[in-house]
Amino acid sequence: MPASLLRFLALAGTAVGLTTNHNHSPSCRVLPGDAAWPSSRDWAKLNKTLNGHLIATVPQASVCHKSPFGQYDAQACEELKSSWDISTITHVNAPGDVLSQNFQNYSCVPFTDPSQPCQLGNYPSYVVNVTGAADVQAALKFAQKHNVRIVIKNTGHDYLGKSTGKGALSLWMHNLKSTKFIKNYKAPYYKGPAAKLGAGVEGFEAYAMANSTGHRIVGGTCPTVGIVGGYTQGGGHSILSSSYGVAADNVLEWEVVTADGRHLVATPTRNSDLYWALSGGGGGTFAVVLSMTARLHRDGIVGGTLLGFNDSAVGNEVYWEAVAAFHALLPDFLDGGNSFTYSVGNNSLTAYGTMPGADRDAVDRLLRPFLDDLASRGITPVVQPRVSTNYYDHFFTYLGPAPYGNAAYFPFTNSRIIPRSLVTDPKSNAVVTDLFRNISQVPAFSPFYCDSFSVADKPHPANSLHPAWRTGMLLCAPAGSWDWDASPEEMAARDRYAAETLQPMMDAATPGGSVYLNEANHLYANWKESFYGDNYARLLRVKKKYDPDSVFYVKTGVGSEVWDVDATGRLCRA
């Protein structure tokens, strides 16, 4: 038995024994301290079954606290503080940690007093370092026998707390890193190059693999996000979406383990209902995904640009008129397979353009309508066009440095998929512009980040992506920041403000839109309609077919209404 597991079992009464020593009815999952909690012998037996792949959770920030793990190291703690909130590798490679500060719950973080005991809080009690289907099957069997909560974590980029849970046994998919290039995938629904990716493959690894074979693949703007996990299962927007659709549109196969331990492959023609649900219906809900096979696209040159402008020469009113015009000009640009990802503040806009296949002359032509409009308003923008020889080079030019990128992380995220029709109509475009303007003036939630796309006509097998994506043009989210100098009560109030004030404001200004289920607030009340729309009833039928006992629970996931997390963190039947 690994020393870490032995140490954890010895500390179980102090580190995680936070509940009273009582039995709880089967309607609730057990927690450490309950009489029904698995014994040390049970956990050791599971570890043997898993060939030593069971990890006792020891939070990274235990180095910042003097008890109970005995790892206090002031210098290591200072180093951890400097990288704690960065969306690169600090939490990605940690078995039990998650990135969202509001789900860290102040239980064991670098910013509290060293005398405060390091407690697991919302973190899982144990983690399975999954190496294949057999590990998942053994963990699911153990969890159901002992009534232990199951969670699934890949990289921990998770705004809604789906990948963690108090007292849980976590399936850590992060080290399933296999990649396979398929030169000519053949199926009734697709013939061409493809890639089979293990569940733990991150964006930067998928991009490198595709690049090495002369291809590109649809993935996210943060390169440390796991491309196979909740990203694609929830839809997956990309700077390539206007050319190839969202990530879910590109999936050819899902390899999974179901709640009852079956090892299945789901495609548009085999277990097609499960394929449909996994392709847009959200991660952690229907089955445990081991791998994904997705389309690759032939690589080539990619035009790019930095485009920025502000109100310094023309005043704020003219600046906002220019923002409205920028949006009105986007449809033609996007329909050519191009995109902008950009941020909008109260007095400046900064955009990065992606134009697949565009040489320098084409880049200049594509930018001309935007530049002419700005010139007509007396605005001189910053424009830095360039042409990259391939997509990998383009991506890391604008979203690098390679391999981990520099994406900031904002835990209080709301989002809105804004219909194209609202920005092409001058009257409703003015309402959308007012929305941008109002949110940009809320200090803790500015700037407004947006990705633009056109995916209405992209070929794809039937999937469960919210229909609003097909009629949408923008996905926008305010940047809700965390402040470790503020009190927990102040941060909780900020969280509620995002859900109860900002999101309704965004909804009201954009009728016909929806909320992206991967980038949303966990307190949002209207999640069922906004995340899933008319697909929900069918998704629920698939959920009940493949997980009739609701083994898999994630906040705001399909079927999650049958569960509730109480004030102590215990998961109970609603």
Curated annotation (Swiss-Prot):
Q: Matching Pfam families, A to Z?
A: BBE, FAD_binding_4
InterPro entries assigned: BBE (IPR012951), FAD-bd_PCMH (IPR016166), FAD-bd_PCMH-like_sf (IPR036318), FAD-bd_PCMH_sub2 (IPR016169), FAD-linked_Oxidoreductases_BP (IPR050432), Oxid_FAD_bind_N (IPR006094)
- The record places domain FAD-binding PCMH-type at 120-299
Q: Where are the transmembrane segments?
A: none
Query: Which cofactors does this protein require?
Result: FAD
Q: Where in the cell is it found?
A: Secreted
Q: Which residues are glycosylated?
A: 47, 105, 129, 211, 310, 346, 438
Report where the covalent cross-link 6-(S-cysteinyl)-8alpha-(pros-histidyl)-FAD (His-Cys) sits: 157-222
GO molecular function per UniProt = FAD binding; oxidoreductase activity
Any GO CC annotation of this UniProt entry: extracellular region
The alphabetical list of record keywords is: Disulfide bond, FAD, Flavoprotein, Glycoprotein, Oxidoreductase, Secreted, Signal
Task: Explain the post-translational modification.
Answer: The FAD cofactor is bound via a bicovalent 6-S-cysteinyl, 8alpha-N1-histidyl FAD linkage.
Gene3D superfamilies cross-referenced by the UniProt entry: 3.30.465.10
**Domain of life (superkingdom):** Eukaryota
What's the main place this protein lives? Answer: secreted
Disulfide cysteine pairs (residue numbers): 28-572, 64-77, 108-118, 450-476
Leader sequence segment: 1-17
Q: How is the cofactor bound?
A: Binds 1 FAD per subunit in a bicovalent manner.
- Family from the record: Belongs to the oxygen-dependent FAD-linked oxidoreductase family.
Q: Outline what the protein does.
A: Probably oxidoreductase that, when reduced, rapidly reacts with molecular oxygen, a hallmark of flavoprotein oxidases. A large panel of alcohols, including carbohydrates, steroids and secondary alcohols were tested as potential substrates, but none has been identified so far.
Instruction: From the Swiss-Prot or TrEMBL record, give the protein name.
Output: VAO-type flavoprotein oxidase VAO615
